[in-house]
């Protein structure tokens, strides 16, 4: 596009909200295509749900024509990926009730706690002793893998005072393996359903998905590709894990401040802590929905809006997932994230089955 068009667009974009429109339109187009394709029998039989198709379409466009559109669409895509995702998760509470949350119970809580702590400590141990990575990179990758992906990395960044380059590396590794997992998890579930290797029901697989996948959106995509029950349980399990971000950041901040004091590097200002308020509101909405105060028609409309928001967020996530991110991340961070990814799947499966056997 010419400089004249770019300047003209820049002037028009001075109007509040105008800069969001091109990106929102692009995300909406991907959403419409994905919803249509998601109802095609072939995709249904392949276990490719609407959200999975949205991120796949986003990746294809993101690595082909999107670089040309990015100057015009970037702000709207960023808005979709961050704010529509959180709004979608908040509205997801209208699909749930406290009774369903109680059904996950102590088992889901213990599994989430075990996965978070084990994954983070493995990241610290391997990252420092085996790969010799710096503490900031290790903590960022560990937080992203053990809690909630890019959101956890962005929340951890001010605590460790990491530069933008290290944040980008950590986010790249999380997005790469989280995206791969979107396709592996439904495939593994279908194989296990056929061969009956492990005693996994739709509910227990939902807990496994929520306790091991990186991003909230990825959890929704995997659960959606299997069944409504799996999706509901997976999101509940994941949101319990996301809620653990706040105490994790508090403990991490205290640890870093203690280490800095021990090493003679006192900070004059307290490290800011980011609390995932969208997770708190999600729980509040689920509680409100438990009382059945709204007519069913309104709740169904909110659920439809929620589906559109989440699909737009997944498309936006795909648009910003670039193949070049693998090269930018480097070998050691990628290898660390790969090992953590394998642990989340294999170790997570063992922890899930073990705790469910003891407390289920």
UniProtKB/Swiss-Prot annotation:
Principal localisation: membrane
Record InterPro entries: UPF0324_pro, UPF0324_YeiH-like
Intracellular or extracellular location(s): Cell membrane
Topology class, membrane: Multi-pass membrane protein
Transmembrane segments: 20-42, 47-69, 104-126, 136-155, 167-189, 239-256, 277-299, 304-326, 333-355
GO cellular component assignments: plasma membrane
Pfam families (alphabetical): Cons_hypoth698 (PF03601)
PANTHER family named in the record: INNER MEMBRANE PROTEIN YEIH-RELATED, UPF0324 INNER MEMBRANE PROTEIN YEIH
Homology family: Belongs to the UPF0324 family.
Protein name: UPF0324 membrane protein plu2856
Organism: Photorhabdus laumondii subsp. laumondii (strain DSM 15139 / CIP 105565 / TT01)
């Amino acid at each position: 596009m010419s400089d004249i068009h770019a300047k003209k667009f820049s002037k028009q974009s001075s109007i509040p909200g105008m800069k969001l429109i091109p990106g929102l339109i692009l995300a909406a187009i991907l959403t419409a295509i994905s919803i249509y394709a998601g109802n095609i029998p072939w995709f249904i039989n392949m276990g490719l749900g609407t959200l999975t198709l949205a991120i796949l379409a986003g990746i294809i466009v993101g690595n082909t024509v999107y670089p040309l559109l990015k100057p015009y669409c970037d702000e709207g895509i960023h808005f979709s990926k961050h704010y529509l995702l959180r709004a979608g998760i908040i509205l997801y509470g209208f699909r749930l009730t406290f009774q369903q949350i109680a059904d996950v119970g102590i088992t889901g809580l213990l599994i989430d706690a075990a996965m978070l702590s084990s994954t983070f400590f493995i990241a610290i141990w391997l990252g420092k002793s085996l790969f010799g990575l710096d503490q900031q990179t290790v903590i960022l990758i560990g937080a992203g893998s053990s809690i909630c992906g890019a959101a956890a990395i962005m929340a951890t960044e001010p605590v460790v005072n990491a530069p933008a380059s290290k944040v980008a590396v950590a986010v790249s590794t999380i997005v790469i393996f989280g995206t791969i997992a979107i396709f592996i998890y439904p495939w593994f579930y279908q194989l296990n359903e056929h061969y009956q290797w492990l005693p996994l029901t739709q509910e227990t697989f939902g807990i496994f998905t929520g306790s091991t996948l990186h991003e909230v959106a990825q959890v929704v995509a995997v659960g959606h590709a299997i069944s409504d029950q799996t999706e509901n349980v997976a999101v509940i399990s994941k949101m319990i894990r996301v809620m653990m971000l706040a105490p994790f950041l508090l403990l991490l901040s205290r640890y870093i401040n203690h280490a800095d004091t021990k090493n003679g590097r006192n900070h004059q200002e307290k490290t800011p802590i980011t609390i995932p308020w969208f997770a708190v509101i999600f729980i509040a909405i689920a509680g409100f929905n438990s009382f059945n105060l709204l007519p069913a028609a309104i709740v169904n409309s909110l659920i439809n809006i929620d589906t559109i928001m989440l699909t737009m967020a997944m498309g936006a996530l795909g648009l910003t997932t670039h193949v070049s991110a693998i090269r930018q991340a480097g070998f050691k961070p990628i290898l660390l994230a790969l090992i953590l990814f394998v642990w989340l799947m294999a170790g997570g499966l063992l922890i899930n089955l073990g705790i469910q056997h003891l407390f289920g």
